[in-house]
């Protein structure tokens, strides 16, 4: 298909997914050799990317070369000139910002959802009815990710803002408590910054994190329990793809992630697929 004809067709498609589907399908048809795909991905997607490399790599004749970090930090690396074919972000904000800078090939595409969970020790007896009061209790140390550099922090701040709607002043108090813990954690060696280590060393009492990672944390530390944030307070995280180059292999990988098999991988890794995968 000639490029001009492709552009005309894209102009008549009304959704980002339609744009991506057509462009990725055309690129897949024209690809004749294996390529490496440089993937920048949110840390919460380690399992997904590993499964993609295992499942999609052989099927699509590609090699996935991943780099993990906070989505905001990864976006900044791209803005500074580092090469990546795909950004798999824990939000749509970073992909949209890259689009606004003219760095994307197609509009950002949502591919998964998540939930926020409150992690605490089972002995604390945290419930949906009392978790806000527990977080507000002066002695309780609450951990979140850092906003801006990591969408997990932005989602936690959004949760605090939602709490503030019915409890004025609570949002600022919770942000202050979380910021204090962040400042303390920043002084630690990177290897010891994980939530499990912070709970083990009794440096935190509660953590706001993605529910997709709570099962692994509870497996490592059976004394911990996770509680899904009530739906009316949850900011409902949405994950997005930024396709940054016309690398045919990258486009095939992005399309695979949106396929039934890709959405099945999303579900298997404890995230919420946008579409119910066929089993």
Annotate each language-model stretch with its function.
Residues 2-21:
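Bacterial N-terminal signal peptides that target proteins for export
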Residues 6, 10, 85, 125-127:
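Intrinsically disordered, low-complexity segments enriched in glycine/proline and serine/threonine
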Residues 7-9, 23, 50, 81:
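General helical structural elements
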Residues 30-34:
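Sec/Tat signal peptide C-region and signal peptidase I cleavage site
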Residues 35-67, 71-72, 76-82, 89-92, ...:
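Exported/periplasmic ABC-transporter solute-binding proteins
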């Amino acid at each position: 298909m000639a490029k001009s004809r492709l552009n005309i067709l894209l102009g008549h498609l009304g959704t980002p997914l339609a744009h991506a589907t057509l462009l990725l399908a055309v690129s897949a048809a024209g690809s004749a050799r294996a390529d490496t795909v440089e993937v920048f991905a949110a840390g919460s997607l380690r399992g997904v990317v590993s499964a993609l490399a295992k499942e999609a790599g052989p099927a699509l004749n590609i090699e996935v070369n991943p780099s993990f970090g906070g989505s905001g930090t990864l976006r900044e690396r791209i803005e500074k000139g580092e090469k990546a074919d795909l950004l798999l972000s824990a939000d749509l904000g970073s992909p949209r910002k890259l689009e606004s800078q003219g760095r994307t090939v197609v509009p950002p595409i949502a591919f998964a959802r998540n939930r926020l969970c409150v992690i605490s020790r089972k002995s604390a007896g945290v419930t949906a009815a009392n978790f806000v009061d527990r977080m507000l209790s002066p002695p309780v140390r609450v951990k979140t990710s850092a906003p801006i550099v990591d969408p997990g922090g932005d989602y936690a701040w959004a949760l605090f803002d939602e709490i503030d709607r019915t409890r004025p002043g609570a949002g600022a108090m919770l942000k202050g408590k979380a910021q204090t813990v962040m400042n303390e954690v920043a002084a630690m060696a990177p290897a010891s910054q994980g939530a499990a280590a912070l709970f083990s060393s009794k440096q935190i009492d509660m953590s706001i994190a993605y529910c997709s990672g709570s099962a692994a944390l509870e497996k490592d530390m059976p004394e911990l329990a996770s509680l899904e944030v009530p739906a009316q307070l949850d900011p409902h995280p949405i994950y997005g793809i930024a396709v940054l180059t016309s690398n045919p292999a990258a486009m095939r990988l992005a399309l695979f992630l949106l396929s039934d098999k890709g959405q099945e991988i999303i579900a298997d890794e404890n995230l919420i697929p946008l579409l119910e995968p066929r089993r």
